[in-house]
Structures are given as structure tokens and as C-alpha cells.
């Protein structure tokens, strides 16, 4: 419950500070996270640190088809929200069954061409994609854009290794020579949670 758009920036800033002081230097945000407020908060928090001290990633929100055709408008807004002049890593967000045709329709939307232009200008240092779609969807995306993709972010954990065919997608990406970045290793915490009965038993042993 609660308001997803509300971010406790004081607590978040403390977490960032702890992470940075312990060697973390990669931070990931996106257009839609926290109802559009994540990039604003991340930008404000990271403004306290030298730009060269961290790597920042964001994503083009193609999961919402109403954003197709708005790559320039969205990208410029993202840079402004994050308070930076470039993204170290930028992704086609959530390549899946719902949006693959739009992502591949360069003639109509030109998303890929625009992002490659920003990469050539140094405003995107590394271009990649994240995927929740099927093996066939990832294959179609790679057949069109794979030669220019520098990394892929996949949902990999012991459930999705076979349930979402992560194993086959990893092998496909290996064939393309594209590094794999792991997301959701605990499936949003679900794989770290016990059933209420089992949790109660453990808590009873050590209140």
C-alpha cells in the first residue's frame, strides 16, 4: 500500500552514501519508476557527488506504447531530471511481446536511430536493453539491433532459469558476444520470503 510516487529522500540519501562509501558506483533508474519521481530523486541525491565517481543508467520507456515516437522529448527530460549531461548506460526498457513490433518499427518511430545518434555524440556511453520477453522476442530484437547492443539485463534466478527460459536467452546472448547483467536474482524478494507458517517457526526459535 501507500503512495508509490513518494520517496523518503533522506533515507534514500543515507542509503546512497552508505553504498558509495562501501564501493558501489553503479546506480540504475528509469522513466517510470516511482510514478516518474525516481529520476528526480536520484538526480538530486547524486548531485552531492563528483560525476566521475559513479555510473548512471536509465532507460527508454517503450513498455508504454504511447511513448513511442517521443525518444528525443523523453531523453532530454531524463538528462534534466537526473541533472547530468550523459548517461553511462542507457537501455531499451523491457523488450517483450507487447512492444517488440514497435521497437523494431524504425520507419515509424526511429527510436534506435535517435539513441545511436546520442551515443555518437557521447550522451550515451553504452547502449543496451532489458528483456522480460520470450526467447523468440529477444532473438528478433538481436537480429535487428544486436550488432550495436553492448549489454543485456535479464531476470535471472533459480525459478526463471527455466520458467522464463533465461538459460536459453543467456546462451543466445553468448552467441552474440553480448554481456549479461542480472536483475531480480531474488525475484523482487519473493525468493527470499518464507511462508507465514515457516517464518513464524523461525521467529519462535529466535524472537
Q: Which sequence ranges carry the predicted segments?
A:
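Active-site groove signature of glycoside hydrolases
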Residues: 80-102
